[in-house]
Amino acid sequence: MRPQKTKILAILKGSTPVLLKKYGVTRIGIFGSVARDDASEESDVDIVYEMSRPNLFTVVHLKAELENILHCSVDLVRYRERMNPFLKKRIENEGVYV
C-alpha cells in the first residue's frame, strides 16, 4: 500500500508528545514523494526532524519506532543549519510539519 500524506501526518501529529518525551524531538514533518502526493507502492517516507539532544543511539530507536507506528520504511533527516545545501533546499520547499 502506498503511503498517504494525510494519514502519515495525522499519525505523526498524534505521536508528537510521545516522541518529544522519549527522544527529545522538537519538530517533525515529511518531505519528498509523500509530501508531494507522488508516492508509489515502493516509496518510503522521508521524515525531517529536529531534536534537542541528538545522538546515534536515540536516532536508531526513533527510526524503529516511526517504522512501527507508520507501518512502512522511513528515511530520517535531521534538519540543521549546516547540512547539504541541496537537501536543505528540498526540505524547505517540500516540507510539511505537524
Where are these regions (language model features)?
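Catalytic core of pol beta-like nucleotidyltransferases
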Residues: 1-27, 35-41, 51-98
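Conserved histidines in hydrophobic membrane contexts and catalytic metal-binding motifs
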Residues: 30
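Short beta-strand->loop micro-motif that forms the acidic, two-metal-ion catalytic signature
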Residues: 46-49
